[in-house]
Regions:
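Long, contiguous binding/interaction regions
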Residues: 1-95
Length: 95
């Protein structure tokens, strides 16, 4: 399968902000991470086979740092947007 380019906009919330901030900084450039009242906002571009696989990999990495981490994400590629809450696909739409 060909690697696709995805644009990610994600809201990450957790009880342990320090652990998640460190995990996010290991995964992404600091300039793509913004601190919010609820946690963090992440805006990056990633390459992978599918939004589902990228989302699963990201949430698994974050939960290794802090188990009680929540991820609300939107993955955009090729005119399609897929929304996830944690590991669950909540919707998909064509642009």
């Amino acid at each position: 399968m060909t690697k696709k380019r995805f644009t990610l906009i994600a809201r990450v919330s957790t009880d342990n902000r320090r652990a998640i901030k460190n995990a996010l900084e290991e995964l992404f450039a600091k300039r793509s991470i913004t601190s919010t009242d609820e946690g963090f906002l992440v805006e990056v571009t990633m390459h992978g086979d599918s939004a589902r696989e990228l989302n699963r990999s990201l949430l698994s990495a974050l939960r290794r740092a802090e188990r009680k981490t929540r991820l609300r994400s939107e993955w955009k590629s090729g005119g399609t947007t897929e929304r996830f809450f944690d590991y669950v696909l909540k919707g998909s739409r064509k642009a």
